Amino acid sequence: MFSGAVLYSEKLQLPGIEIMKPIFLAVFCILVPVSCTPSAGISVPNLSTPSSLEESQILFDDFSYSTIDEMTYNGWVVRSGSGWPGVTGATFRPENVSFLDYPDPADNRLLRMTSSTDGTAENTYQTQICHQRKYMEGTYAARVRFSDQPVSGVDGDQVVQTFYTITPYIEPLAPDYSELDYEYLPNGGWGSGDLTFYVTTWETVQIEPRNADNTSSSVQGSLAGWHTLVTQVTGGTVRYFVDGQLIAQHGGEYYPDAPMSINFNLWFIDGGLVQVEGLREYQEDIDWVFHQAGIALMPEEVEAAVARMRRQSIKFRDTVPAKVPALVSPCNF
């Protein structure tokens, strides 16, 4: 449900994908993040790039790990226990995170999240990783692999494959809540059809009863395979890119208010499990993640920065200072 009215819409194009971009829409959404869209006039900023990566505040992780302990040493938390989001009664399980060789480029490794269900809450296992809460304005990017079907078992569960930044959920409708989402729903959900991709920027939220104040844009069509996701957060505007193409621009009251953590998760929508017997497993792969503080980099600049660090055999770099005092960084939302 939402309030507002679309006057008319126009189409943007990704290869094989159609994007509907309404030109005017009231921007307060309730219950599900499916109805609000960017304001008219998507634009690209004037950019200012530092003279070298060494002078910048950067997070880069190539996920070239062998164990979870190596990953947590570099500031990551692998979630355990239960809680939002996902199926009520499901469990977030650290052993769902694994690392494997991927020869593109040569000698590369990646992180894999595997989530599974048999249609019951007690046998539903979800996955989430979180980095420290110290990121605000600048550029966020990740190279991820989405999938349209489970790797085993029957298809149809409403699974959500993500890359996002977020503040902790402290209280309902907190004024300093912030969240920026990429969410791929190959089997639909939240009232959408199959193969729906959302980018959503949040002002605030209340979990129970559900009250979500956000603005969201959607893409229809398969995004199975590898994609580079880039978010620019500067000058009061949030811009979302997929594979170099600008697909949405949000701002105004939805612009982030507070430092966020960087997260990935793979979870199932509550009430969206197929009620058939048998285990099914879904996967999302992550090649790398990148953040440049304070500066809007274009996707090609991000790719160049990542390529440069790889040529220098840099597997991990974190020169983004923690806040003083350090902010609490729960991995539970």
Kindly give the residue locations of the regions a language model identified.
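Short, Lys/Arg-enriched N-terminal segments with co-localized hydrophobic residues
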Residues: F2-I19
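Bacterial N-terminal signal peptides
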Residues: L25-P33
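Low-complexity, Ser/Thr/Pro/Gly-rich disordered linker/stalk regions
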Residues: G41-D157, Q161, T165-P168, F290-F333
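Short tryptophan-centered beta-strand motifs in secreted/extracellular beta-sheet-rich domains
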Residues: F63, Y140-A142, G225-V233, V238-Y240
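Aromatic sugar-binding interfaces of carbohydrate-active proteins
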Residues: T72, G221, T237-F333
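Short edge-strand/loop segments of extracellular domains
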Residues: V159-D176, N187, Q245-L246
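Glycine-aromatic-enriched beta-strand/loop faces of beta-sandwich-type recognition domains
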Residues: E171-T228
